[in-house]
Amino acid sequence: MKNEKRKTGIEPKVFFPPLIIVGILCWLTVRDLDAANVVINAVFSYVTNVWGWAFEWYMVVMLFGWFWLVFGPYAKKRLGNEPPEFSTASWIFMMFASCTSAAVLFWGSIEIYYYISTPPFGLEPNSTGAKELGLAYSLFHWGPLPWATYSFLSVAFAYFFFVRKMEVIRPSSTLVPLVGEKHAKGLFGTIVDNFYLVALIFAMGTSLGLATPLVTECMQWLFGIPHTLQLDAIIITCWIILNAICVACGLQKGVRIASDVRSYLSFLMLGWVFIVSGASFIMNYFTDSVGMLLMYLPRMLFYTDPIAKGGFPQGWTVFYWAWWVIYAIQMSIFLARISRGRTVRELCFGMVMGLTASTWILWTVLGSNTLLLMDKNIINIPNLIEQYGVARAIIETWAALPLSTATMWGFFILCFIATVTLVNACSYTLAMSTCREVRDGEEPPLLVRIGWSILVGIIGIVLLALGGLKPIQTAIIAGGCPLFFVNIMVTLSFIKDAKQNWKD
């Protein structure tokens, strides 16, 4: 019995270092918010200006890797001997569900405003050219390119899961073919896992930092409760308590049902916006934007703006590539686990087509609605952001739709459920990654899950206290730097092992 407890307890070497590092950073930030903002700006400037090119080349190289998988020697290889666990329709729906987080709702509604007001390529702000390119850049940042990079890593993890029959709960487990078992299970592997966990904690904290203001702004609109930092903290605390109750009382089935409700409600809300906002304009704008994307794609791929130094690629493209990098392992593990029995080509094509369709629908519908409201002078986004913050501006893009009360209730429920499932997923992923061998069908310890959800909540509150988008962007970019190298090592390890062990 004692031995069993030891196995399912925490793994000290990957539990305490991330906890201590993140705790110290949060304490230093809260101690002096002004000084923290100075450091944040310096870190953001250094990483994006000095190393931004590396993120851009990483995405391009991974895209070529996708083509190699689809048309190369492993294209027809099957990931496991069993038939696919899910039907193709269910498989694609599960992919779509993974895209409907509150953070996605945040960016989908407001991103186009930033692209139009501070456009790339030296275009005039709010000009016709800026508007024509606005949605095209969203389709670039949330389109086939990043999903192609995820599909490569998903194939790698699916190979380790279903072909090599490895238990992978941390990235170091996949590095045995590359660095050897001694190093993968030793200090080197521990460092890799700690980099992964620290980055993942900050990524989840930033997602919570984006999601919470949407819920509190909805509460202000619906109930007249003023949006304050204290209310944000109370809401995050309520989510943590709700998550603890769900875990303690065995209500995980309820959480899964909530996740399904989130997906169906997302379809309903997007359909409503599409119909009442202007279906004809949305389809025309999308079609034109695809053409703009194809025309400007080479420039977008390698745009670093070293001469004019306008800051657009650093503030957006590098930021988003770091965002994709930081979530790559967690997301790829999930996508790999639902893809058992599929061929490499099927997984690569299914992910790129299915997930691109999901994100393109979200960004096209929400972005087009925002542009229409701006052009018709129904809402003044710059004034809303200056006076009340970004979250209020997003809420107003929904409140401006017909049947505003019903629409706002739908959006409120969607954001609330999305964040509940986010907190649950955060605590589960971190607990699984910091515990000793939790077997299939078992749950990580309750206190560990609650502890991680509290820490993620604290990070969300700290980022909200700092104010603005820059702290959130910096947290993502800083976390993406070490995972940039971890993702490359996982990729190389897969290529090396497959070459030796995945033959006809």
From Swiss-Prot:
Keywords from UniProt, A to Z, are: Antiport, Cell inner membrane, Cell membrane, Membrane, Transmembrane, Transmembrane helix, Transport
Per the record, membrane topology reads: Multi-pass membrane protein
Please list the coiled coil stretches.
none
Q: Which InterPro entries match?
A: BCCT_CS, BCCT_transptr, BCCT_transptr_CaiT
Q: Name one GO molecular function term.
A: (R)-carnitine:4-(trimethylammonio)butanoate antiporter activity
Q: Which residues cross the membrane?
A: 10-30, 51-71, 92-112, 143-163, 195-215, 231-251, 263-283, 316-336, 347-367, 398-418, 446-466, 475-495
Which biological processes are named by the entry's GO terms? 4-(trimethylammonio)butanoate transport; carnitine metabolic process
Top-level taxonomic group = Bacteria
Q: Name one GO cellular component term.
A: plasma membrane
Q: What is its main location?
A: membrane
Question: What catalytic reaction does the record list?
Answer: 4-(trimethylamino)butanoate(in) + (R)-carnitine(out) = 4-(trimethylamino)butanoate(out) + (R)-carnitine(in)
Pathway field: Amine and polyamine metabolism; carnitine metabolism
- Location relative to the cell: Cell inner membrane
Write down the Pfam families for this protein, in alphabetical order: BCCT
Q: Give the family from UniProt.
A: Belongs to the BCCT transporter (TC 2.A.15) family. CaiT subfamily.
HAMAP family from the entry?
A: CaiT
Tell me, in a sentence or two, what this protein's role is: Catalyzes the exchange of L-carnitine for gamma-butyrobetaine.
Describe its partners and assembly state: Homotrimer.
NCBIfam families, alphabetized? bcct, PRK03356.1
Q: What is this protein called?
A: L-carnitine/gamma-butyrobetaine antiporter
The species this protein was found in = Escherichia coli (strain SE11)
